[in-house]
Amino acid sequence: MRIDLNCDIGESFGAYRIGCDAEMIAIASSVNIACGFHGGDPDVMAVTVERALQSGVAIGAHPGFPDLAGFGRREMRLRPSEVTNLIIYQIGALQAFVQAAGGRLHHVKPHGALYNMAAVDDELAAAVALAVKRVDPQLVLYALAGSCLVETAKRLGLTVAQEAFVDRAYRSDGTLAPRNLAGAVITDPETAGTRAVAMVKTGCIPSMDGDLIRIDADTLCLHGDNPGAAAIAKAVRASLETAGIAVKAGFERT
């Protein structure tokens, strides 16, 4: 039994430092690197790619809405073509840094509001999936498990890694609880570790409303910018390995 453990990194920019990238890279099996729109800048992207390649983790682009002030977590209403183009732009930027460093881009995972909106909006899901396919149909798309983005991407012939979150609470419909709700962000390392093992071994976790929801995950996400992120990540990886679950990127590019 195995599971991919991914984390969002490279979100610092200019004088602003966000997250604990070095610690997260050492724990994860795949990483999602910001591409300059919600976070990141050229220097941060270059350094983060180099660190990821040295660690041997799978590297993915982490495109978001053009919203540095809101960290890409505010909804934006854009035409589908605009969404497709802004994702192509960001994938291209990160892909260039990866190739310049001698690596190969493995996957794409949308960020923040873009991720959440594409999980429930068919038109937006199609815009996201189309962007990935146009850049490189061999790229793996990381998407919320059970969401419309998963089905849309599969219809376009993309390989999809269905994602679950060990540091976020769920609503009964399988979507993530908004961050402004009490308890929406899991900050206790032991709780996060227990949830991770349950997700992999049983495929079920309780929602915030107490309902048991089904989650078939190929990859588990940890946020590098959450409070105590490094401690949570260490606890999750240790819990998985203690339970006999190997941590490894789940899909290989051909």
Curated annotation (Swiss-Prot):
Lineage start: Bacteria, Bacillati, Bacillota, Clostridia, Eubacteriales
PANTHER family to which the protein is assigned, alphabetical: 5-OXOPROLINASE SUBUNIT A (PTHR30292:SF0), UNCHARACTERIZED PROTEIN YBGL-RELATED (PTHR30292)
Pfam families: LamB_YcsF (PF03746)
Stored CDD domains: LamB_YcsF_like
Catalytic activity: 5-oxo-L-proline + ATP + 2 H2O = L-glutamate + ADP + phosphate + H(+)
Signal sequence coordinates: none
Enzyme class: hydrolase
One of the GO biological process terms: carbohydrate metabolic process
Gene name of the record: pxpA
UniProt keywords, alphabetically: ATP-binding, Hydrolase, Nucleotide-binding
InterPro entries documented for this protein: Glyco_hydro/deAcase_b/a-brl, LamB/YcsF/PxpA-like
Assembly notes: Forms a complex composed of PxpA, PxpB and PxpC.
The enzyme's E.C. designation: 3.5.2.9
Name of the protein this chain belongs to: 5-oxoprolinase subunit A
